[in-house]
């Protein structure tokens, strides 16, 4: 377990004072290491010099969506709960905004699952869910919707206390705007109402919590193995997801998930109600999480030490080669001017240790919708809520991705190719013998073309469905208007 000796044990950091905020951040903090990536920026571990307290600092490039960043800071400033990550202050440094937050030494729940390569037990899930519900109860009382609840956004400190984090897509719910109409969140955790853009309120977080409970129990959310585009169509139309092997879980846990995953928001339980559920009320204290936290932190430390040993070994080998090369000068044969050739074997960045841990969440990211004049690649930002899209705006994201895939797939022309991959169609007769005559490069290009083709077919099906559905909706609306006139 990580311990930090405070230089001034009588004083704990609560908020950065005015004097600290007028200084350069390096004068106030010692940045120790990079922890990972959050919404809109990188997160670092640092020490507050005056108190010795460990903090987390999110460094966000100023060219990122400043409106979203300011919203995140505003929401964190307003929150004061032991179940929500605390905010201490922020700085502008060169082209970055530094956001100073509470440090949770054990990392996220998804980090722990990944490091241990084990899912959680019911007891462990109940304890985490209880703290998460208390955090949601507080946020919802403050009329705020988190909108991105998942295991990757539930952080644990070394004592086992769970806290909600990453407010990059959180929203304020005002009395004049009882429901929101923007598609924001991470696809597989989205509530049906969020996907359909029919308006949603705080209980959208409850659906995401139910999906997160399944994620903690099974290691990944439902539909994680299929294309996100298909999942987005399946979530609103299919029955609520359940455990793959229900017999492995207690009736109380199964019922809790069932209460979270009610498709109708009006019938879905609230955070206050779920805190009284038998599964949650039976939860044990945070101390039961310490063993798994210690195990995960030990694994992480051993991996870091192993990586450092490898880097040190590479440095030694490179240093030996560099010394050998630098001590040998070779005169070019027959060249009277004496050309000296020097071989540089030192690789750039040999002393930099970067951890690349691929997780489901990092691959998925967070979906936020673009306004029409934005062209941010790979990240979708929030749509202006005053606009009335003619169709679900999340489709714009996949259409943009399809275009990018087509550019990446077909933009590189190879000499000798007689047929463009974009002209290729999947054989309808099932005869694929001709594939044997193609090169590996050609086969790879054809394979990369399949996803855009599939998305195009799905879009065509969606349009046909909409063309049949809309007249029915219009007829229903017309009948309602006639009834109102009587």
Curated annotation (Swiss-Prot):
Pfam families: Mst1_SARAH, Pkinase. Its EC number is 2.7.11.1. Residues 305-332 are annotated as: Disordered. GO terms for biological process: apoptotic process; hippo signaling; intracellular signal transduction; negative regulation of canonical Wnt signaling pathway; positive regulation of apoptotic process; protein tetramerization; regulation of MAPK cascade. Residues 29-280 form the Protein kinase domain. The modification Phosphothreonine is found at residue 182. Its cofactor is Mg(2+). The record marks 325-326 as: Cleavage. It is found in: Cytoplasm; Nucleus. Stress-activated, pro-apoptotic kinase which, following caspase-cleavage, enters the nucleus and induces chromatin condensation followed by internucleosomal DNA fragmentation. Key component of the Hippo signaling pathway which plays a pivotal role in organ size control and tumor suppression by restricting proliferation and promoting apoptosis. This is Serine/threonine-protein kinase 4. It comes from Gallus gallus.
């Amino acid at each position: 377990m990580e311990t930090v000796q405070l230089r001034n044990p009588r004083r704990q950091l609560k908020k950065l004072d005015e004097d600290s905020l007028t200084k350069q951040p390096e004068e106030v903090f010692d940045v120790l290491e990079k922890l990972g990536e959050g919404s809109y920026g990188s997160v670092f571990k640092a020490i507050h010099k005056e108190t010795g307290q460990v903090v987390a600092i999110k460094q966000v490039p100023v060219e990122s969506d400043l409106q979203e960043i300011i919203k995140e800071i505003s929401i964190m400033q307003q929150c004061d709960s032991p179940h929500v990550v605390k905010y201490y202050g922020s700085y502008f440094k060169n082209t970055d905004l530094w956001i100073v937050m509470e440090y949770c030494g054990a990392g996220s729940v998804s980090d722990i699952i990944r490091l241990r390569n084990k899912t959680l037990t019911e007891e462990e899930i109940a304890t985490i869910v209880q703290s998460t519900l208390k955090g949601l109860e507080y946020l919802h009382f403050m009329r705020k919707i988190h909108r991105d609840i998942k295991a990757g956004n539930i952080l644990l400190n070394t004592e086992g206390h769970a806290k909600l984090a990453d407010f990059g897509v959180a929203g304020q719910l005002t009395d004049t705007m009882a429901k929101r109409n923007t598609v924001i969140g991470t696809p597989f955790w989205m509530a049906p109402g969020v996907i359909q853009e029919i308006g949603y309120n705080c209980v959208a977080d409850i659906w995401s919590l139910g999906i997160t409970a399944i994620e903690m129990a099974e290691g990944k959310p439902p539909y994680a193995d299929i294309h996100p585009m298909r999942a987005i169509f399946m979530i609103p139309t299919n029955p609520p997801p359940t455990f793959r092997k229900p017999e492995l879980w207690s009736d109380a846990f199964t019922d809790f998930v069932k209460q979270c995953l009610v498709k109708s928001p009006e019938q879905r339980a609230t955070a206050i109600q779920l805190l009284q559920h038998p599964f949650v009320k039976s939860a044990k204290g945070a101390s039961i999480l310490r063993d798994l936290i210690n195990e995960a932190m030990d694994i992480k430390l051993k991996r870091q030490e192993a990586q450092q040993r490898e880097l040190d070994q590479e440095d030694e080998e490179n240093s030996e080669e560099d010394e050998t090369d630098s001590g040998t000068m070779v005169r070019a044969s027959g060249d009277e001017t004496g050309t000296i050739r020097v071989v540089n074997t030192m690789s750039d960045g040999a002393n930099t240790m970067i951890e690349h841990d691929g997780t489901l969440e990092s691959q998925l990211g967070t979906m936020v919708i673009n306004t029409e004049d934005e062209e941010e690649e790979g990240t979708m930002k929030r749509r202006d809520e005053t606009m009335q899209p003619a169709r679900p705006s999340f489709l714009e994201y996949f259409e943009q991705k399809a275009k990018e895939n087509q550019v990446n797939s077909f933009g590189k022309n190879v000499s000798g190719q007689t047929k463009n991959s974009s002209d290729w169609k999947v054989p309808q007769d099932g005869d694929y013998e001709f594939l044997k005559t193609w090169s590996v490069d050609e086969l790879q290009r054809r394979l990369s073309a399949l996803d855009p083709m599939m998305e195009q077919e799905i879009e065509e099906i969606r349009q046909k469905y909409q063309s049949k559905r809309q007249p029915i909706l219009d007829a229903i609306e017309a009948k309602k208007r006639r009834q109102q006139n009587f």
